Amino acid sequence: MNIEIREKDDERAVFVVEGVDDTFINTIRRICLVEIPTLAIEDVNIYKNDAKMFDEVLAHRLGLIPIVTDLDSYVMPSECDCESGCQHCRVSFLLKEKCEEGNDSKIVYSKDLKSDDPAVKPVYDTIPIVRLREGEEVELEAIAELGLGSEHAKWQATTTCGYKYYPKIEIDTEKVNDLEEYVEECPRNVLQIEDDTLVVGNIENCSTCRTCQRLSEKDDNAIVVDFEESKYIFKIETDGSLKPFDVLTIACDILSEKADNIINFVNEEE
């Protein structure tokens, strides 16, 4: 298997994978979507809420705030030895804000959540939680714990995770006429003209829409659009709780563990 990185930052990664089949790459995709543990607010104790927003809506909005996840310091509640929650499986956030007299309104943001662990905090500071009017106050405690995307979308580490087959375009340059027309009709600007010859530019931008192939019917099917066997373009974006390649590493570890469990089961049955 060969991997070539095209883009990489703290929230997005694009890379080309070669030498695997779609069953393997789709398994990695599904694990990234629903089996990567992340921190999210699960329980909310509301002590005071003068805002017009219902308690249930407020709690729901808190649950969807992405939280920086430290998998080395926390474990899933089901794997913790405690019975009621402890510092190894839960993180507490306190929120106490008031719109003082003389102010028309005040927006409470995610940055106003105060964590008892400095390393665990909302990924973004400017997520609006609730608007308070003059004299209104909100006070609550929010408890975050690890969970899986298969249980609730708030625990999904990835916002986008998918792949496409690596495109392939074959051009019979001796048959192609009206080169400018092909360039203009390509919606992804893949085709270019170099030295009076129609060539493929950035092939990875191709969506295999086959517009050029249909257009080439007038030129005796001079263009054929297909895809490479066992070669894919994989894209992954996270909500910031984990970095993309951390998600991929964990996904591969999970897949390896599943394979080991099957091997051990088979060996025990023999």
UniProtKB/Swiss-Prot annotation:
Binds 1 [3Fe-4S] cluster. Its cofactor is [3Fe-4S] cluster. GO terms for cellular component: cytoplasm; DNA-directed RNA polymerase complex. It catalyses: RNA(n) + a ribonucleoside 5'-triphosphate = RNA(n+1) + diphosphate. Gene3D superfamilies: 3.30.70.3110, DNA-directed RNA polymerase, insert domain, RNA polymerase, RBP11-like subunit. SMART domains: RPOLD (SM00662). It is an enzyme of class 2 (transferase). It is found in: Cytoplasm. GO terms for biological process: DNA-templated transcription. [3Fe-4S] cluster binds at residues 206, 209, 212. Keywords: 3Fe-4S, Cytoplasm, DNA-directed RNA polymerase, Iron, Iron-sulfur, Metal-binding, Nucleotidyltransferase, Transcription, Transferase. The keyword Nucleotide-binding does not apply. DNA-dependent RNA polymerase (RNAP) catalyzes the transcription of DNA into RNA using the four ribonucleoside triphosphates as substrates. Belongs to the archaeal Rpo3/eukaryotic RPB3 RNA polymerase subunit family. Part of the RNA polymerase complex. This is DNA-directed RNA polymerase subunit Rpo3. It comes from Methanosphaera stadtmanae (strain ATCC 43021 / DSM 3091 / JCM 11832 / MCB-3). The gene is rpo3.
